[in-house]
């Protein structure tokens, strides 16, 4: 009897398909998926426990699968084994009195948003695509455009139910914001990308519903001018979003969205979103005092949606042309220097680099476009680029995670950290069955 036959006695087993073979990682850098794997779709932690206990005894790799929206190859099954999909783990309950939602790992961002709204609450950060799942967002510590004001996924996870590699079910945290009760295993699991345990359920913090927005679009002559404005605005207030786009990114967003941006002038453009009109007014004055070409305020939903659409469609316009999506994060005051020096580096390698991102928190999205013979020089360029980010006080990924794509840079740039991570992995998963080859190399 094969191990697949044995597994089918525990849970229904499905054959491999492309729906579980890939995620959103650009194909040129995506890890190669295994041809042979099976898919299981457990409904609860008890079923997950039985699957993992079996897999651990047989030393069979298990690859976790949420919404498949990741950009670092974290959900790609790179070896023959089991793809564990959380799509049936959709339990969702809102405890409005305590302002929390208890979610199965397969609950999507849209389902969480809608449930919170029905109870007069909100989930503010919006850290991923609407089809991203709670489990996946926790596993990557997803961020998004509102991180400056509302933080990342880590700031909303109050408790977790998870299953260890040997099948043990653990519960960490509670329904409370405060927790000073020993080592924070909760925060060790957040951002672990499925390599330490399988997240099955989470208690998510909710907030009051957000107020009406005011959106500012502000072109600047230079990136330095724009970033001076970012630093000054963020020093005095916290916008819901504080985005930047270089001119080429704006042009791409316009083309794909079919919308017209407010100005064709300027090297850099800022997009600010406020919940307070008074703050928006003060930010506009700051921008004008720091050399803005003009300040455009959108107060109607139609005008706001038009501006947000230009920003939101940039990647769609680049998707088929990029080698990959880089998301280094640097201190906000260093964005202009990082942008200038990364462009100089790209020019040395003959690479066209399109840049935009979350200016308020320093998360820079860069898209190197495909060029002839890219395989010979691109990875050397990427290492130099990420080394530059680290030299400026930054990190190699702000929100997309390491997955299978940035392993070598993590190991080379943070060797002491990498070794500690290997030891932690060995403690949680000594047989290395959980998402092997992701975040840390095979043990």
UniProtKB/Swiss-Prot annotation:
Domain of life: Archaea
Pfam families xrefs: FAD-oxidase_C, FAD_binding_4
Catalytic activity: (R)-lactate + A = pyruvate + AH2
Activity response to pH changes: Optimum pH is 8.0.
Keywords per UniProt: Cell membrane, FAD, Flavoprotein, Membrane, Oxidoreductase, Transmembrane, Transmembrane helix, Zinc
InterPro entries: FAD-bd_oxidored_4_C (IPR004113), FAD-bd_PCMH (IPR016166), FAD-bd_PCMH-like_sf (IPR036318), FAD-bd_PCMH_sub2 (IPR016169), FAD-linked_Oxase-like_C (IPR016164), FAD-linked_OxidoTrans_Type4 (IPR051914), Oxid_FAD_bind_N (IPR006094), Vanillyl_alc_oxidase_C-sub2 (IPR016171)
All ranges on the Cytoplasmic side of the membrane: 204-383
GO cellular component: plasma membrane
Residue ranges of domain FAD-binding PCMH-type in the record: 32-209
Bilayer-crossing regions: 183-203, 384-404
Free-text remark on how the cofactor is bound: Binds 1 FAD non-covalently per subunit. Binds 1 Zn(2+) ion per subunit.
Membrane-topology annotation of the record: Multi-pass membrane protein
SUPFAM superfamilies in the cross-refs: FAD-binding/transporter-associated domain-like (SSF56176), FAD-linked oxidases, C-terminal domain (SSF55103)
Gene induction: Constitutively expressed.
Primary location group: membrane
EC numbers for this chain: 1.1.99.6
Gene Ontology molecular function: any one: FAD binding
Needed cofactors: FAD; Zn(2+)
Thermal activity profile: Optimum temperature is 90 degrees Celsius.
UniProt cross-references to PANTHER family, sorted A to Z: GLYCOLATE OXIDASE SUBUNIT GLCD
Function: Catalyzes the dehydrogenation of (R)-lactate (D-lactate) to pyruvate. Is likely involved in the utilization of D-lactate as a sole source for both carbon and electrons for dissimilatory sulfate reduction. Cannot use L-lactate as substrate, and NAD(+), horse cytochrome c, methylene blue or dimethylnaphthoquinone as acceptors. Active in vitro with artificial electron acceptors such as 2,6-dichlorophenolindophenol (DCPIP); the physiological acceptor is not known, but potential acceptors include cytochromes or quinones.
Family the entry assigns: Belongs to the FAD-binding oxidoreductase/transferase type 4 family.
Stated name of the protein: D-lactate dehydrogenase
Organism: Archaeoglobus fulgidus (strain ATCC 49558 / DSM 4304 / JCM 9628 / NBRC 100126 / VC-16)
